[in-house]
A protein has these predicted regions:
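Short, small-residue-biased leader/transition segments that mark boundaries at the very start
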Residues: 2-4, 8-10
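Anionic-ligand binding region
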Residues: 130-152
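Short, structured active-site "lid" loops
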Residues: 39-65, 172-175
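Glycine/small-residue-rich loop that forms an oxyanion/phosphate-binding "nest" at active or ligand-binding sites
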Residues: 56, 64-96
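N-terminal glycine-rich anion-binding loops that anchor highly charged ligand groups
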Residues: 17-29
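A short, acidic, amphipathic alpha-helical segment used as a generic capping/interface helix at domain edges
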Residues: 175-191
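Local cysteine-cluster metal-coordination motifs and their immediate loop/turn environment
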Residues: 6, 28-39, 64-75, 125-134, ...
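Short, flexible loop segments at boundaries between secondary-structure elements
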Residues: 88-109, 157, 213-241
Length: 241
């Protein structure tokens, strides 16, 4: 399992080990290369992809707590190596065993419930890559439904982009700002005390907008709630904890 950041690593390792997995985090891993890929820099994207392939190919499964990273590996790596048969084969092998975290828990391991509690109401944003490239929609909701004390309030337009879109927010900042402002309004209109999602880029984007608007809505990665670690990890954007 490839994870970045100590809190993320502990959170995701906890979920995977509870499900019976032996988890390793190779030190040789690097960025998946998506920013370079989306910017048209195929040379840099291929260099990074080779490092990722070499770091992870020997594992049974590769799990990422980000739909965008998992989708990059699963759907875009093989085509990067159309002119390199050796790495094309390796990329295809890695793509076949790469999964988004919550999808892996439910669809591959068959996890039906989690041992966690969270008092309060939450709403859920469906990130573009997880939803559209990997089919992640029902899986997080199914597991959240087993968290003691949690009430899930569906977010209006939950499938609409938050405006982050990787390099999109840099290329089209005005459009991106309008989109995240609309998303923040939907979140606040939901009445939920906590916003959850499965992709850190989306979460950082939405947390920043909500904070600038003075909202008290907490923003968290869905895995923090599923792992029962909300008392150990501050909400995203909370600089006081």
């Amino acid at each position: 399992s490839g994870l970045v950041g100590s809190e993320m690593c502990i959170r995701d390792r906890t979920l995977l080990e509870r499900a019976g997995c032996q988890v390793e985090v190779p030190n040789t891993q690097t960025c998946c290369g998506q920013p370079a890929y989306n910017s048209g820099d195929r040379t840099s994207a291929k260099d990074l992809a080779r490092q990722v392939i070499d770091a992870f190919l020997g594992y049974d499964h590769v799990v990422a707590p980000s739909g965008s990273c998992a989708a990059m590996i699963a759907h875009h790596y093989p085509a990067l190596f159309d002119d390199d048969p050796e790495y094309r084969g390796r990329a295809e092998a890695l793509a076949a065993k790469t999964h988004e975290l919550v999808s892996f828990l439910t669809d591959v391991l068959g996890v039906k419930d989690v041992d966690a509690a969270y008092e309060g109401s939450v709403t859920y944003h469906d990130s573009c890559s997880g939803l559209r490239e990997l089919g992640v929609k029902a899986q997080p909701r199914a597991l959240l439904g087993t968290v003691q004390g949690l009430t899930l309030t569906e977010l209006e337009d939950s499938e609409v982009c938050c405006g982050f879109g990787g390099t999109f927010c840099v290329k089209y900042p005005d459009i991106s700002t309008r989109m995240v402002s609309d998303k923040a309004k939907r979140v606040q209109d939901s009445g939920a005390g906590t916003l959850l999602a499965g992709d850190m880029g989306c979460l950082l984007n939405m947390a920043g907008r909500l904070k600038r608007e003075g909202s008290t809505v907490r923003v968290r990665h869905v895995a923090e709630v599923l792992a029962g670690m909300t008392h150990d990890v501050p909400p995203i954007g909370d600089g006081t904890s």
